[in-house]
Amino acid sequence: MAILNIEKSFLTDNRSVLDFLNQTGQGLYIPLYQREYSWDSDNIDQLLEDLTRGIQRIARGEVTDDTKELRFLGTIITVIESNRDNIYPVDLQAVPSRIEKLIDGQQRISTIALMATVLTKRLIEICHKVKPTNPIYEQVEEICDIWVKQKLINIFSFDLGRGKPKLKPKIIRGEKDFWTRDKSVDEAYTSELSNFLGHFIQAYVDNTILPSLS
């Protein structure tokens, strides 16, 4: 009889959501047996309340300087997938360098990815409204550059370094989506979440009108 050592099989890592989603080359793979994205407005409102309470705690100084990260969104369980044969379908030219199967927390992570697209769209709209003659133009450009290009983008996409576009949706669903080097968004991503992320990324790269959540 094989004995499973739970402590060795599951390692915990306390990190912020931003740290988790900003890992270089990270792709999140949702197994087919996991339910589709199904959160309604009540679930999203609860997540926003949790975020708000955490930010208020930081503002009140109730969180120490060395832990000023948003660490209050619950547990996320992932498993590193090193065998590409377990990813289906697969384009071997477009596999991210780090694949994590998302076992628990996919509704939260998916919602956060969608929220990041909303913030990205809004920040870009604000930046475009500020004219170069405005005294704060450079500061606004710098803020947008830091938050959009260095933070928000990494929450819903990863840079493959090749393909058209080089940015790919961070989250896909088994048997419905596959990371692709050059195929169209509609060919590669058929789940509602990944299809939206794919079209959002394409519009961002092409500098065209960014889609909105319906």
Locate predicted features.
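Glycine- and hydrophobic-rich flexible loops that cap the catalytic core of alpha/beta enzyme folds
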Residues: 2-214
